Amino acid sequence: MANQKGLHVVMMIITVWLLYAAPNIHGWGKEGHEIICKIAQTRLDETAAKAVKELLPESAEGDLSSLCLWADRVKFRYHWSSPLHYINTPDACSYQYNRDCKDESGEKGRCVAGAIYNYTTQLLSYKTAASSQSQYNLTEALLFVSHFMGDIHQPLHVSYASDKGGNTIEVHWYTRKANLHHIWDSNIIETAEADLYNSALEGMVDALKKNITTEWADQVKRWETCTKKTACPDIYASEGIQAACDWAYKGVTEGDTLEDEYFYSRLPIVYQRLAQGGVRLAATLNRIFG
């Protein structure tokens, strides 16, 4: 117990340093990742909830969502982790692990799907891990999984290499300059939060949780289903590239101004991907720790 308490103190110091020493650049954006982790934490069974609380540093005060951005911020110290946030595909609306899961040097497995496989497998050792070092790695593994499960559900994190996931497609979001990737990372969610929820993130979280038990209730079992003990990121990535083609890229050309028509037609897709990310993160942790 003393060793574990000491570990939590070390983790708190390291985590705080990493969080505040790095620039504020995010995946889904702060709100999107928080939403996914908030949804997930409410769906954890008792065993998984206990494991998550034990692995989180004391600074998190038991709140997984407070550290769901850790993986974004730490990549400026862990440079090797940058390619683990996305998948580059050909301009063909399809994803294949063996073809697409690699970094720019061609090293296989270095993409968000490969990272999810890796870190969920590490978490399987939680029950038998004894040393402080392995516990520290499992804390990082939990934070990586929680973040990457969000990234893989953002459609433009599984998208075309030719435009860097929409990052090179310059448009306007209403009156503001933006690129298409940033619109899906942040602008759609921020606009919804401001216009539909009085800038209250909890209102959006509550609405999504309600939809999970009502509007999407008949789909949740399918979202949770995975034949592996850990996660099924290839399914999530295949859905992602399809959503990118059908919704993110569709009808958009360089220099366009995207306004209400794009916002209201794409918002349901954003809502669904956030909900799927939260449901699947919880299901993954329940399988691993159960």
UniProtKB/Swiss-Prot annotation:
Propeptide cleavage-removed residue intervals: 283-290
Binding residues for substrate: 28-33, 72-76, 85-88, 94-99, 118, 136
Top-level lineage group: Eukaryota
Reported regulation of activity: ssDNase activity is inhibited by the divalent cation chelator EDTA and the reducing agent DTT. Divalent metal ions (e.g. Ca(2+), Mg(2+) and Zn(2+)) and DTT represses RNase activity. RNase activity is enhanced by EDTA. Also repressed by vanadate (VO(4)(3-)) and phosphate (PO(4)(3-)) by occupying the active site.
InterPro entries (alphabetical): PLipase_C/P1_nuclease_dom_sf (IPR008947), S1/P1nuclease (IPR003154)
Cofactor: Mn(2+); Ca(2+); Zn(2+)
Any Gene Ontology biological process: DNA catabolic process
Keywords associated with the record: Calcium, Disulfide bond, Endonuclease, Glycoprotein, Hydrolase, Manganese, Metal-binding, Nuclease, Signal, Zinc
Keyword hit for Calcium: yes
UniProt binding sites for a divalent metal cation 3: 28, 33, 151
Biotechnology: Can be applied to high-throughput detection of single base mutation.
GO molecular function ontology, one term from the record: double-stranded DNA endonuclease activity
Annotated site, Important for catalytic activity, chain positions: 72, 75
Gene3D superfamilies for the chain: P1 Nuclease
Temperature dependence: Optimum temperature is 70 degrees Celsius. Low activity at temperatures below 30 degrees Celsius. Above 70 degrees Celsius, the catalytic activity declines.
Binding site for a divalent metal cation 2: 157, 181, 185
Catalytic activity: Endonucleolytic cleavage to 5'-phosphomononucleotide and 5'-phosphooligonucleotide end-products
SUPFAM superfamilies associated with the record: Phospholipase C/P1 nuclease (SSF48537)
E.C. code: 3.1.30.1
Glycosylation positions in this chain: 118, 137, 211
Region listing for Substrate binding, in residue ranges: 147-196
Binding site for a divalent metal cation 1: 72, 85, 147, 151
Similarity section: Belongs to the nuclease type I family.
Function: Endonuclease mostly active on RNA and ssDNA, and to a lower extent, on dsDNA. Can cleave mismatch regions in heteroduplex DNA containing single base pair mismatches or insertion/deletion bases. In contradiction with PubMed:22506810, cannot hydrolyze single-stranded DNA and does not cleave mismatches.
Name the UniProt record assigns to this protein: Endonuclease 2
UniProt source species: Arabidopsis thaliana
